[in-house]
A protein has these predicted regions:
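FMN-binding flavodoxin-like domain, especially the glycine-rich phosphate-binding loop
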Residues: 2-4, 8-35, 39-172, 236-241
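A mid-sequence, solvent-exposed acidic-amphipathic segment
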Residues: 159-191, 196-199
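Iron-sulfur cluster-binding cysteine motifs and their immediate structural context
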Residues: 183-184, 189, 193-217, 221-238
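Generic structural motif recognizing short loop/turn segments at the entrances and edges of beta-strands
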Residues: 1, 25, 178-180, 208
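Residue-level signal for the start and early helices of compact helical domains
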Residues: 40-42, 173-175, 179, 207, ...
Length: 243
């Protein structure tokens, strides 16, 4: 049996996991947020995640450190990014190595950016092109994984990417507490959709309003999920996000 573990905020990683699962066949997908350290048995194990601040999301770092997997399982990683890939795959390989786990292959996929805190959505035309490229890359990855082929880490060839990644990633530890800057206006109807869709179960509903519990990943799922656009972050994100 093939297995894929994923972390997703606004859906890019979930799409990749679903698309790859379909191509591989005999594959199950699992949320990384629900992994508690149990041993994973499987023919192959895929780890799918977005790039945050030019590196790994904190939840992925935690997952890799506690990952317990059979010695004969072929392990690969897929990092998707909207801007630049940074050093996410290098980090992934290093953390797994410290944990005594070998990363056999890894891949980069450029997807429509979803970092609503920094920029708006790309045009529909650009998004369609990126999704078309993703579909082709999935076929390539599936063929690669089926024969358990080894490969070197896919890296960015942009100099500015390699320079910026160290500067920006040092701020990743601030993400957990950054949820203190979320606000909710009177348009909130208390539907609880933000809490249900939070990728790390960081939101609880209190008296009909969302309450953030300070282990946020800044994935923007809550903002994207709100049907009334009632959630804002630092008064900067109350706008349509078409992803």
């Amino acid at each position: 049996m093939n297995k894929i573990y994923y972390f997703t905020g606004t859906g890019n990683s979930l799409q990749i996991a679903n698309d790859l699962s379909e191509k591989l066949g005999q594959c199950t997908i699992h949320k990384i947020a629900e992994y508690s350290g149990e041993k994973i048995d499987g023919r192959t194990l895929g780890i799918v995640f977005p790039v945050y601040n030019w590196g790994l999301p904190l939840i992925i770092c935690d997952f890799l450190r506690k990952l317990d997997v059979s010695d004969d399982t072929y392990i690969y990683a897929i990092a998707n990014y909207g801007g630049l890939p940074g050093k996410a795959l290098d980090q992934c390989k290093d953390i797994l190595k410290e944990n005594g786990v070998k990363l056999s292959a890894d891949f980069l996929i450029n997807m429509p950016g979803n970092y609503i805190f920094g920029y708006g959505a790309k045009s529909k035309k650009v998004q369609e092109k990126l999704f078309a490229k993703e579909a082709k890359k999935i076929i390539y990855i599936a063929d690669f994984v089926k024969i358990k082929k080894q490969c070197k880490i896919e890296k960015s060839h942009t100099i500015i990417d390699r320079v910026w990644c160290n500067y920006f990633y040092k701020h990743i530890n601030e993400f957990h507490e950054a949820d203190q800057y979320y606000t909710v206006d009177n348009n909130c109807i208390g539907c609880g959709l933000c809490a249900k869709r939070c990728s790390v179960n960081n939101i609880t509903m209190v008296n009909g309003n969302p309450n953030w519990n300070h282990h946020c990943e800044l994935c923007a799922s809550c903002i994207q999920s709100c049907p009334k656009k009632a959630i804002d972050y630092k008064s900067e994100t109350k706008k349509e996000k078409d992803i």
